[in-house]
């Protein structure tokens, strides 16, 4: 088989593509990446690198010369440029018409509503109702927001930033959801309609950045089943090929929210691998990165099932401006029982930047999911990683 047919192109070269590049050889595949920086993590492992901006259509055309299919590490792409390339026979997975309703958060919310899935109340910033919704609000950039960037909690009119120079249609407002937990689920589908759905996980955010993830989430089985069902519905409706992550709000149980369907709100979709799925590298039979590659190349999908009782993934976030390698801390983390450390090799550290992660496993497959178990390990990891 020609090398081009066994090479997957990835738009993006960060840590998600880096982890894909680690999995590719095990599947008999090569990886080519389109990324702007020579020091981006995936550059060191990719078989071919196109150094250009993520949204550069000509760069994507060059990428396509080296691969049989192109997939995505992030959603910061220029869809019209890609559509021109698709018309010339370049294959993208997910397909561009499946991506189209997901890239803009406003359009994504309407897509979910039309599918009959519950979402928080939301409005375009330019068309707020005459009777303003109660504070607090969540102000969101409709595109290019991630890790808390492009999201702001608005507690009063005084908190509103000056957006007078913002292009129309670039911001939206939604009601703040007083949730009990934040959950996530990742699903994968290939062109034959075969699917794998990972266990539902709980995510812990601090300052709107994910700090840790516990899998499976310690929640009622009916709630987990509902979240996974929503994932299947979205994948099938879009005739999706690739990987999709869904973030949820779980509302507190009450007389107003007695059923799983009433307690779950869909927050956001991400048409790519996701931070909430990093645990799968060490805790599942097949990682999210391997499943994405299998799906977009038409391979049989591996199992997404856990091969341990429980796992907790802790992000290693930057807390200073530095170029250090943090080897002493990494060695201590690696010495923790059933620990797996992943260091992304980024050239510089700054506060809040995701530099790596560590996953810790409970090998007892008969154990019940426990928040206390996860929180104890998170404390151990963060005591090692962060200075006093």
Curated annotation (Swiss-Prot):
Binding sites annotated in the UniProt record for ATP: 105, 140, 174-177, 182, 267-268
Pathway the protein acts in: Purine metabolism; IMP biosynthesis via de novo pathway; 5-amino-1-(5-phospho-D-ribosyl)imidazole-4-carboxylate from 5-amino-1-(5-phospho-D-ribosyl)imidazole (N5-CAIR route): step 1/2
UniProt xrefs under InterPro entries: ATP-grasp, ATP-grasp_carboxylate-amine, ATP_grasp_subdomain_1, PreATP-grasp_dom_sf, PurK, PurK_C, PurT/PurK_preATP-grasp, Rudment_hybrid_motif
Keywords: ATP-binding, Ligase, Nucleotide-binding, Purine biosynthesis
GO MF term (any one): ATP binding
Keyword set includes Nucleus: no
UniProt GO BP: 'de novo' IMP biosynthetic process
Enzymatic reactions: 5-amino-1-(5-phospho-beta-D-ribosyl)imidazole + hydrogencarbonate + ATP = 5-carboxyamino-1-(5-phospho-D-ribosyl)imidazole + ADP + phosphate + 2 H(+)
Entry GO terms, CC: cytosol
EC number: 6.3.4.18
Subunit structure: Homodimer.
Family assignment from sequence similarity: Belongs to the PurK/PurT family.
NCBIfam families: PRK06019.1-5 (NF004679), purK (TIGR01161)
Listed name of the protein: N5-carboxyaminoimidazole ribonucleotide synthase
Species: Synechocystis sp. (strain ATCC 27184 / PCC 6803 / Kazusa)
């Amino acid at each position: 088989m020609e090398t081009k047919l066994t090479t997957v192109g990835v738009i993006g070269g960060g840590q998600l593509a880096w982890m894909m590049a680690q999995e590719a050889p095990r599947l008999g595949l090569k990886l080519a990446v389109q990324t702007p920086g020579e020091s981006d993590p995936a550059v060191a492992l990719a078989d071919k690198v196109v150094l250009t901006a993520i949204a550069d259509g000509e760069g994507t055309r060059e990428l396509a010369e080296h691969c049989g299919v192109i997939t995505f590490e992030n959603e910061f792409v220029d869809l019209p440029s890609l559509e021109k390339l698709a018309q010339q026979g370049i294959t993208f997975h997910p397909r561009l018409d499946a991506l189209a309703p997901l890239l803009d958060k406003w359009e994504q919310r309407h897509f979910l509503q039309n599918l009959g899935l519950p979402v928080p109340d939301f409005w375009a910033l330019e068309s707020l109702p005459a009777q303003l919704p109660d504070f607090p609000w969540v102000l969101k950039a409709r595109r290019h927001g991630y890790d808390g960037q492009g999201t702001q909690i608005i507690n009063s009119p005084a908190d509103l930033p000056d957006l007078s120079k913002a292009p129309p249609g670039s911001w939206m407002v939604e009601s703040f959801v007083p949730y009990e937990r934040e959950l996530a689920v990742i699903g994968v589908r290939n062109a034959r309609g075969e699917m794998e759905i990972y266990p539902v996980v709980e995510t812990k955010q601090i300052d709107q950045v994910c700090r840790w993830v516990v899998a499976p989430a310690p929640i009622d089985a009916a709630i987990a089943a509902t979240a996974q069902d929503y994932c299947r519905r979205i994948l099938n409706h879009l005739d999706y090929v690739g990987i999709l992550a869904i973030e949820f709000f779980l509302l507190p149980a009450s007389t107003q929210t007695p059923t799983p369907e009433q307690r779950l709100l869909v927050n956001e979709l991400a048409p790519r691998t996701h931070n909430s799925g990093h645990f799968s590298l060490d805790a599942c039979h097949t990682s999210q990165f391997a499943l994405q590659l299998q799906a977009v190349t038409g391979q049989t999908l591996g199992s997404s099932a856990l091969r341990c009782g429980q796992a907790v993934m802790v992000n290693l976030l930057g807390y200073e401006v530095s170029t250090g390698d943090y080897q002493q801390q990494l060695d201590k983390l690696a010495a923790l029982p059933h620990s797996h450390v992943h260091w992304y090799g980024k050239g510089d550290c700054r506060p809040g930047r995701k530099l790596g992660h560590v996953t810790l496993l409970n090998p007892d497959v008969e154990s019940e999911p426990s928040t206390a178990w996860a929180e104890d390990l998170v404390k151990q990891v963060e005591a090692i990683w962060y200075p006093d």
